[in-house]
Amino acid sequence: MNTIDKIFNYNRQPNISPFFKEKLVELISFGTYHNDIEKIRDGIVQELVNYREKYKITNVVIGMSGGLDSALTASLYKTAGYHVIGVTLPIHQNPDETARGVEAINALGLDHKHIDLSNQYDFVVADTISNFGDTSIGNDDRATAMRRGNIRARLRMITLYNLAGKYKGFVASTDNFSELAAGFWTLHGDVGDVAPIQSLTKSWEVPAMAELQGVPSSTIQAVPTDGLGIANGDEDQFGFSYLEFDIALFTLIKNLSLANATESDLKIIDSVKSRVRNSGYKRSNPYNLLHPMFPARFGELEILDEQL
């Protein structure tokens, strides 16, 4: 199976438009879709080993959603010699998602904790209505669904950080590069302390590395969801696939020609532009203002960090 066929297979997508296929071929030739996944994996694992040795922290807590990203993240920490605690945290969740999380935990040989947060979530939503009079929190529109999704993400992160404190460890981030660019995460929610796969593309490097790491095929082939109840899946929110998102993103990053793009192709390109532009504030959070008199203070503190 050649690289393009592998990419289509990982993305459950038999084909893409001629323009997007043309750009994919260009990106493969540039090395953006690099074949040496093992070398990339080894580099990430070494960085995780370096972090463990520098800070003397061996325990890591990971929310196991049943998705590919959390399973790959857990496997990389395991390979790097960490004690990994995988936590399933359903909130009115599809049982299949939780079952996949448990399957990945067992396949990777992780410790498992299970905490159903559905009652806590219901209490927060009900309390928001009763104490603040915010009846709109129950609306069915997309914006309100995102607010409720953010409550889910932040409840999970409170729980994960509490466990990390118990085990004197830290919380892993599980977001990938595509999610980073799209703004597909909750500030102070489904993020953590160390992000091993945040530089990896969802359409290629994440599934290819997961296969290399022995992540169950049922997880690799599962439709990507955020577990926040916002839509039927990540790609449902996009209106197109992660593969098309990644190709469009790198077409913009590398300033490739749009000469052969159809109107439908350009709609995807414009949608990606909009998502990246509108989520920039999240990638710069917290936005630290420089001291008006002593603008070098942050840099001086970074130097001290390195010295110590």
Which residues fall in each region the model found?
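Conserved G/P- and acidic residue-centered "switch" motifs that form tight phosphate/ATP-binding loops
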Residues: G67
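ATP/NTP-dependent adenylation/nucleotidyl-transfer catalytic domains that generate, transfer
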Residues: N2-I62, T79, I85, H92-Q93, ...
